Amino acid sequence: MGLSRRKVLAGGGTALGTFLIGGRWVDASPKTARELGFTPQVLTAAQCEALEVTGDALVPGALKAGLAPFIDSQLALGSGSKLIAKYLGVDPLGQQSFYRAIADNLIINLAHPDTTAEQLTGSMASDSVSEWAGPPASYAFFVLRADALDVTYGTPEGFAALNIPYSAHIQPETSW
């Protein structure tokens, strides 16, 4: 049986991925990849930063949990990606363009000196972002929040942070 999103989440949330760190390919969790300074393969550093800042405003802890490495590594898988957008009607082969468009919109809007990530997410939720092109802002809000939740709380450690017993249908083989 192939790897499914359900299997990834049941197996500890964010499965280990392969990340370029310091010029070497390393198997690591998104959190570790971020801590070690991963090099994005699909998104730019600016796009990663915009997704992380906004994702962390939606789900505190998402930045530290490795939201950008998680999204970037999944986008690098093409049709094998397990990002939620795939299950919400975004063609797996079009996910890179979808996430780039979201990130580019975030970059433009976060560049305004009087705009915080928290203010921007509020505007995204109501589709009232003045400078937004591409996927609807509320849809981007939903997708980014779901990805941030997956990487932050889709692990045994995430459940512990919520003081919820971790009861996976399939226990992960290893913890990270």
Annotated model-derived regions:
Residues 2-7, 19-57:
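C-terminal segment of N-terminal export signals and the immediately downstream linker at the start
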Residues 5, 66-74, 159-169:
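Short alpha-helical "patches" and their helix-cap loops
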Residues 12-16:
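Sec-dependent signal peptide hydrophobic core
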Residues 17-18, 63, 153:
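A generic secondary-structure boundary signal that marks alpha-helix termini
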Residues 37-40, 48-142:
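Flexible, low-complexity segments enriched for small/polar residues
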Residues 130-176:
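Long, amphipathic alpha-helical surface segments
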